Design a protein with these regions (language model features):
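PLP-dependent enzyme catalytic core of the Aspartate aminotransferase-like
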Residues: 89-95, 99-108, 114-149
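Surface-exposed helix-capping loop/turn segments at secondary-structure junctions
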Residues: 36, 56-65, 148-149
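Conserved glycine-rich beta-strand-loop-beta hairpin in the small C-terminal domain of fold type I
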Residues: 21-24, 28, 43-53, 65-81, ...
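A short linear hydrophobic-aromatic micro-motif
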Residues: 53, 62-65, 107-112
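Conserved core segment of the aminotransferase class I/II
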Residues: 1-46, 53-55, 144
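Residue-level recognition of strand-loop junctions within catalytic nucleotide-signaling folds
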Residues: 1, 32, 77-79, 127-129
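Non-transmembrane alpha-helical segments in soluble domains
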Residues: 28, 53, 57, 75, ...
């Protein structure tokens, strides 16, 4: 009985397994009537990605933006930051992430969170209003210009 209780608690720790009537109705509405909304959302997110790409091309061209892979999470290659003579980054993605969070109040994810190969990359969520994205990119550029270059 104790094992059953522990398993049940582990499954329901975030209450994601419980179905409630409102969730069922919302899910049905999303599947049956959400096509236009989803199309508009995808178009808006594509616009945010294009805005970000233009921003980096014009203001931070040394940082390549990777193509989207079916999501709204953008990978930015920051390996050029403070490069040593051998081309390796002297500022790791963890340090850059911390500087963005503490100095600019901008939350990004360090590539190292995602395992080997992530060092030197940061991940940015662009599923937000464009004005918020623009503000975040300006803060990112401020930090890069002030501390990295």
């Amino acid at each position: 009985e104790e094992v059953r209780r522990r398993i049940d608690r582990a499954i329901n720790i975030n209450e994601v397994c419980d179905v409630n009537p409102f969730g069922v109705i919302a899910t049905m509405a999303a599947y049956n009537e959400g096509g236009e909304w989803l199309d508009a959302l995808r178009k808006y997110l594509r616009g945010n990605y294009e805005y970000l790409c233009c921003f980096f091309k014009e203001r931070l061209p040394q940082y390549p933006v990777l193509p989207l892979e079916g999501t709204y999470l953008v990978w930015i290659d920051c390996r050029a930051s403070g490069s040593n003579s051998d081309g390796a980054s002297s500022i790791g993605s963890d340090a850059m992430t911390l500087r963005l969070q503490e100095g600019q109040k901008l939350m990004v994810n360090s590539g190292t969170m995602y395992g080997p190969g992530g060092e030197g990359f940061i991940r940015l969520n662009i599923a937000c209003p464009r004005a918020l994205l623009a503000d975040g990119l300006e803060r990112m550029a401020r930090l890069f210009y002030r501390e990295v270059f």
